[in-house]
């Protein structure tokens, strides 16, 4: 689909660039069962598990009244590869920022397996 990217996705992409400067954010946009379009089945590896946790984190944030994680922008800083959610966020923004921050840190610590990029969701994620 060529819908415009939600602003929050743009911020998340920049967070990933902060913690994993060696890779394009695009490498994480269609990985395993949970990174990007998926959201079911058993995570294929640690990186995919990062995305499953991120999905669950967004689901928790949605419980905050009026909070839509996919469109909620937030205030954060990247300093030498370290992400900080700043104090200017309301409850929703703070939650979403932390979801994205923790995922970006998780991505940095997880091995990337090229075989798990753009997998067959039907076959592997039931």
Curated annotation (Swiss-Prot):
Disulfide bonds join 18-78, 33-125, 35-51, 50-106, 57-99, 67-92, 85-97. PLA2 catalyzes the calcium-dependent hydrolysis of the 2-acyl groups in 3-sn-phosphoglycerides. It comes from Naja sagittifera. Binds 1 Ca(2+) ion. Belongs to the phospholipase A2 family. Group I subfamily. D49 sub-subfamily. Its cofactor is Ca(2+). It catalyses: a 1,2-diacyl-sn-glycero-3-phosphocholine + H2O = a 1-acyl-sn-glycero-3-phosphocholine + a fatty acid + H(+). Its main location: secreted. Keywords: Calcium, Disulfide bond, Hydrolase, Lipid degradation, Lipid metabolism, Metal-binding, Secreted. PROSITE patterns: PA2_ASP (PS00119), PA2_HIS (PS00118). Heterodimer formed between two homologous isoforms: isoform 1 and isoform 2. The lineage of its organism: Eukaryota, Metazoa, Chordata, Craniata, Vertebrata. GO terms for biological process: arachidonate secretion; fatty acid biosynthetic process; lipid catabolic process; phospholipid metabolic process; positive regulation of fibroblast proliferation. One of its GO terms (cellular component) is extracellular region. It comes from the Eukaryota. Signal peptide: none annotated. The active site is at 54, 100. Pfam families: Phospholip_A2_1. One of its GO terms (molecular function) is phospholipid binding. InterPro entries: PLipase_A2 (IPR001211), PLipase_A2_Asp_AS (IPR033112), PLipase_A2_dom (IPR016090), PLipase_A2_dom_sf (IPR036444), PLipase_A2_His_AS (IPR033113). The keyword Cell division does not apply. The keyword Signal does not apply. SMART domains: PA2c (SM00085). This is Acidic phospholipase A2 2.
